[in-house]
C-alpha cells in the first residue's frame, strides 16, 4: 500500500513540475538569426495569428492560425536600418506573397 501511495505522490509531483512555466522559445528566436527563413525583415505591422483581419487570409492560403508560433508580419520588405522605423524582424516559419505575409516573426534584440 505504501508503494502505491508513494507512486501517486511522485506522479502528482512530476505533473506539478511539468506545469510550471518554462522560458519561452520566442526570446531565443529574437537573438538567433540562424532560424530566420530569409533575410531580416522590416514589417509594417506585427499582429497575432488569431487576428480577425488576418484569419480569413490564412484560411484562404490553407494555413491553420493555431499552428503559428510567434507573430505575423504584414507588409514586410528586406530590412535596411536607414529606411526601417522599427526593429528588424526574424521570421522563422514562412515569408509569403512577396513579404505581404510573414509567419513566426519576432523583433530582434
From Swiss-Prot:
One of its GO terms (molecular function) is structural constituent of cell wall. Disruption phenotype: Disruption of all 7 hydrophobins leads to altered germination kinetics, decreased survival under exposure to extreme cold stress and increased mycotoxins patulin and citrinin production. Pfam families: Hydrophobin. Keywords: Cell wall, Disulfide bond, Secreted, Signal. GO terms for cellular component: extracellular region; fungal-type cell wall. The keyword Kinase does not apply. This is Class I hydrophobin G. The gene is HfbG.
